[in-house]
Amino acid sequence: MSNNIFTNNYTIVDKLSEGTYGIVYKVEHIESKKNFACKKFVIDNNFTYCNYNELIAHNEFNHSNLIEIYDILVDYGHDKCTYYVIMELCDGCLFDILFCDKVFLDESQRLDYLIQIIDGLEYMWSKGFVHNDLSLTNILVKNNKIKIADFGFMYNRFIKQDIYHRNTIYIQPPELISGHPRICDPNKIDTWALGQIFYVMCYNSVLYNYSNKTDYYLDIISKTNTPSLDIIDKLYLSDKYKKLYYNIFRKNIKKLTQNAINELVCYNKSTNKFSNDNLRKKTSSNKFIKKHMNWSVRHRPDIKQSRKLFYEILANKYPIYNSPIIQSIIPSTISFREFSFHKLWSSMNNYDYLFKSNLLFGIHFEYKIRLHHRFDYQYNLIVKIMLLMGKIIRSCFSKYNKFKCLNKFIYPNNNYLLSSQISRLENSFDRFYSMGKIIYCHYPFFENYIFDYDTIKLSNSLEFQYHFIDILDKEIPCLDAYDIFLLSNCNKMYQKYFKYMYYLFVSSPNATVFDNNIVYQSIMLIIISYKNSLIYKKLINQFLKLNISTKIKYSREINHCFNDDIINVIEIDNDYGINLNYFTVDTIITAYYIIHICRLITNEKYNLLNINFAIESKFIKYLDKLVSVIDME
């Protein structure tokens, strides 16, 4: 570097890396003696897209998970300018940590890194940009803090590109590899890469790393999932490709020639990487990875949806007391927002299908089950089994799996052949509870056989729970709304109300559809409404609007007016200890649905539960009033 404004202030210590658009040095500030990273690039008449993006990043970004740019120095020459971008110096990149240093990250560290990457990408997304080059070398680490760097390939997500810059091949989605940007969604490029990055953090190996398209496509199919024929057509893949790969994975053997099968066998022998045992494991982390590496751009998550999928990893992590808990400061006040009719109506369209199903689990109200609500451990297992059963029954009703999963857990009884499918399903739930009762009666030192003589002997509750999951090929949701309540700083004087309301809520199979945090907030809203007369009146008003919204069909029957989404805001003192600033429209609708569940429960079952949970008559009368409101025609 020549003598200029840069050398007057900094001394080069070491060369860190060199790329197409610049060189990165480790430098020392002469006056303060502090070390920084410096990226040097030259701009002449051919001012490049990548150079311009680096300058945008300096002006637009300010986030703890994006590399901080402290200063930009410019040395003006005769026919060119040399830029020196002074940045914070990091300890290294993920590539160095995972492959050079061969560090294996434990689960808590992986999840911590993952949520930091999501935070950084979501911040860029909120500013209108996608990174577009999220490789291992561009994710830096400083004191265990993720720093996303190198913004040269980023795009404005609101602008459809005719041509996308090619980045590192293993992080490119199929639509870019195939050279068809017209089906590319800028919002989904980073999330494909995010799935790849998280795979490397989990297994210390790169999932896809081929130099040609044919091997790359086969690798995607053999290690993750098979694309639909529609997707293959959109990518203009050859007929030979469709015949060889698509049909094999769809098991349409009759359509295959022996030559095609031999060709695939030769590929297996030559690469020895046809399958991937890591992704065959049914874990929450693998589910996250596979969802992000979806061939279909439409079904691939964007960064907002990635955050929700991250929380599903936490929700399904076992056991609960090892799950990372995101702490927040409890605000001194809570805002209750009154939403306009148009906002409630438009949001209600997302929930409309739930109100068409009036299924309840009858066994949930039987005496032998109601006995187990007194202790948190017993109550927790009951509601978790209910949530698991909800997942199963929804799986039974889905158009792809209708009743196919019944053979996993149905057992014969005297009326088995005479029963309907739903009756068989509910009769089988009795067995779930009897399995759970083993823990109730013998925990923590029980010795029993599960599923009679042909199953294994268990010695502790965690082993029981593991095999319970394994037998059913499902996951028990462990971080549910009640767990969130227990782990929060909410005033525990409201615990009995919360337990009671949540017990009512999980009697519906649809309980598994709702976000656990929203359910927690909605039940707390119902409790706050019981204690605060002003909130009660406002909540009733919102429910009345929702009554009307359920009766109005989509778009044509409603007068679209350009009114505000929020028409009023009321602040109350946060004497409840809830870690929330305000209630969202989803919280209002979920509270409405919880009261809808109460409405479906017969008076007989309702009264039995009231006695078991020792709920005072005043609270019951309050719920009756809410039920009467949503029962209006």
Swiss-Prot record:
Q: Where is the active site?
A: 133 (proton acceptor)
**First-level EC class:** transferase
Q: Which reaction does it catalyse?
A: L-seryl-[protein] + ATP = O-phospho-L-seryl-[protein] + ADP + H(+); L-threonyl-[protein] + ATP = O-phospho-L-threonyl-[protein] + ADP + H(+)
Q: Which organism is it from?
A: Acanthamoeba polyphaga mimivirus (APMV)
The record's listing under SUPFAM superfamilies reads: Protein kinase-like (PK-like)
Q: Might you give the EC number(s) for this enzyme? A: 2.7.11.1
MF annotations from Gene Ontology: ATP binding; protein serine kinase activity; protein serine/threonine kinase activity
Give yes or no: UniProt keyword Nucleotide-binding: yes
Segments passing through the bilayer? none
Q: Where does ATP bind?
A: 16-24, 39
Alphabetically sorted, this entry's keywords are: ATP-binding, Kinase, Nucleotide-binding, Serine/threonine-protein kinase, Transferase
Residue span(s) of domain Protein kinase: 10-314
Q: What is the designated name of this protein?
A: Putative serine/threonine-protein kinase L232
Cross-referenced InterPro entries: CDK, Kinase-like_dom_sf, Prot_kinase_dom, Tyr_kinase_AS
Similarity-based family: Belongs to the protein kinase superfamily. Ser/Thr protein kinase family.
